[in-house]
């Protein structure tokens, strides 16, 4: 349970680490848009996205294996979607048994798309500490203050939630052991039995979360925390040349993909015209 | 049931370089039936890892040595952990955090229903009643209450009842007195002695509290860096300056006082229980503060 590598921060002092969290979030979103823009079967677009991730990983000095590990957590999901495409796609000509050529291409397309998105997302969380991430989101949501949306509180809730994930994992471990010692069985029986067996774990976990929330609120109160109004920052987010470079690169990626799409679209138009 | 560990080893994350951590290093120990056995040592010395082996919460690693609890061979793949856990009760720190059921009755009966599937409702009621009265709670008063409505001390009692209701032969307690006030602590330790007299045969206590160990344990093992560096009676352990220094533990109050009074020539020795120590001191004082 301890090896949750998706979303764990990898401390370093690299170019990417030093970038403004707001810019990194925007770049990550733009990158995902780019991945989705790659239209069907034009794998050159995916190659461009992969190149972008590899480049970013090299610059960020995060070991490649560490980034690849994040894919491990969703491998089941990827394989499942690919299998669905393989066996239930009826278009195209049959290559082998029930598998069609369109099915094969679609499966490859889905695998590439999900993997690229997860790689990009995990690179963001690997190079941005949870605190910076929360600050970045707060910064990006700032315009919502105009409609009285509690942006600062929202960001605070998020960073607290992130902070408590490891604590809750430890706690779950302890409670599972305590109930196992009382004969609880989590490993046998059908799915309903197993779900029911989790009640003696979930209820104590819920109660201890409330207790922790209470304690945390007291601790914040005793340090005179009073919300966004009086709060100043130790680390101010600042948009620098690094962020400009990042934004330019990702903009280049999007333009390139749109161009490729247009190029292919024109090509196929020309083909159709030629056939006519 | 005897607990016998021979060359027991355990490494956390053995395959990951940098993260792997050897928690147990050639542990050899024999805990006899009827003992109150103390397991002492600093945080991270391997105490908890060791006791969690005893009821199979942590499984013996391949090539990790031998561990036998009564007739159960824990290195055997076919070991029946469920029936083992019925015989080895385990209580963790802050046991009240494991409460979950709607009523005290349901919570205490949880272990019973898990361990004996075909037990009758009457028998469950009888056993729960017995367990609750053993820990000093009034069955009729608390059985239908929500465990979350009870006071802290009562919650802990309910949690203990939920462990001893299965009538374990060995009871393992991890820091049993943590977070209790002095009165609660005293009452709890008296309860332990009562349990040992007529309920469970062997009690194994993991603790930082040397006073508790000196007072109640028949024998103890000192853990340091995953190794057992000494096994013996509290008297033997706390008299040996080497062990105390190596393990980084405190002396129990009685041992420290005995040491001081010995150097001043007021008493000769004591076995470090409060009763024996005060007796020796009274005799010394009656003789005008000098060794007779």
Regions found by a protein language model. Name each.
Chain B
Residues 167:
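Conserved catalytic motifs of ABC-family nucleotide-binding domains
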Residues 146-150, 154:
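Conserved ABC ATPase signature
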